[in-house]
Amino acid sequence: MMMLKIGPYEFSSRLLLGTGKYPSLDVQKEAVEASGAEILTFAVRRMNIFSPEQPNFLEQLDLSKYKLLPNTAGAKTAEEAVRIARLAKASGLCDMIKVEVIGCDKTLLPDPIETLKAAEMLLEEGFIVLPYTSDDVVLAKRLEELGCHAIMPGASPIGSGQGIINPLNLSFIIEQANVPVIVDAGIGGPADAALAMELGADGVLLNTAVSGAADPVKMAKAMKLAVEAGRLGYEAGRIPKKRYASASSPTEGMSVV
């Protein structure tokens, strides 16, 4: 498979993994390793990045193996998102940022206007910007035109496990994009991840589907395989759907009984 390219970085794995809500730090570490992910995302507001005396998951990982993708979860305005992003960058962890500006506490759907504003401000400051957005086709294009390095449309609401609700819109976003499209949020199981990749997505970001599973480590491995299978299937090119049957064996030369 081809490498996933985001800005100046290249990755072998197309699975991006969130680091929240695992049963324990040990399970989290095992799941991260089982997933094969090379990009790990975390909420800056939930990390003690400037308090070394406080435990956090970064302490138990070999950071030479991973690229960290801080996110601005908790931000309600563009200005809040920018402040959080600056805090992450000041820690020296990474220059990539996942822009997340929530517009509705009940659905956790992103605020399109504030997301666009935050992305523009952060791009001006030299960040590598990956905005979390809805499956709005026009907004996705506007974010790309702004200069975002990848687009991250949601499959369904965060943590809902509903899978891909609108595959048509996702396919439109993917078709028109000239930057990576990473399906983010709502993935419930391996079939959802595989479908996202079969649609042509460049990657999948998930968290709750693994951390909330009965066996997070086993689910992490399942997601790894699903993303790989979906991408291989997309690159191979599936057969077109037809209304009627088509024999899989050649009919030439068959004797008449």
Curated annotation (Swiss-Prot):
InterPro entries, per database record: Aldolase_TIM (IPR013785), Thiazole_synthase_ThiG (IPR033983), ThiG (IPR008867)
Function: Catalyzes the rearrangement of 1-deoxy-D-xylulose 5-phosphate (DXP) to produce the thiazole phosphate moiety of thiamine. Sulfur is provided by the thiocarboxylate moiety of the carrier protein ThiS. In vitro, sulfur can be provided by H(2)S.
Designated gene of the protein: thiG
Recorded family membership: Belongs to the ThiG family.
Record keyword Transferase present: yes
Active site: 98
Catalysed reaction, written as an equation: [ThiS sulfur-carrier protein]-C-terminal-Gly-aminoethanethioate + 2-iminoacetate + 1-deoxy-D-xylulose 5-phosphate = [ThiS sulfur-carrier protein]-C-terminal Gly-Gly + 2-[(2R,5Z)-2-carboxy-4-methylthiazol-5(2H)-ylidene]ethyl phosphate + 2 H2O + H(+)
Self-association and partners: Homotetramer. Forms heterodimers with either ThiH or ThiS.
GO cellular component, one term: cytoplasm
Disulphide bridges: none
Organism: Geobacillus kaustophilus (strain HTA426)
Superkingdom per UniProt: Bacteria
Binding-site residues, 1-deoxy-D-xylulose 5-phosphate: 159, 185-186, 207-208
Known EC number: 2.8.1.10
Alphabetized Gene3D superfamilies for the sequence: Aldolase class I (3.20.20.70)
UniProt keyword list: Cytoplasm, Schiff base, Thiamine biosynthesis, Transferase
Predominant place of localization: cytoplasm
GO molecular function: thiazole synthase activity
Pathway: Cofactor biosynthesis; thiamine diphosphate biosynthesis
Subcellular location per the Swiss-Prot or TrEMBL entry: Cytoplasm
Top EC group: transferase
Keyword Cytoplasm: yes
CDD domains: ThiG
The protein, known as: Thiazole synthase
GO biological processes: thiamine diphosphate biosynthetic process
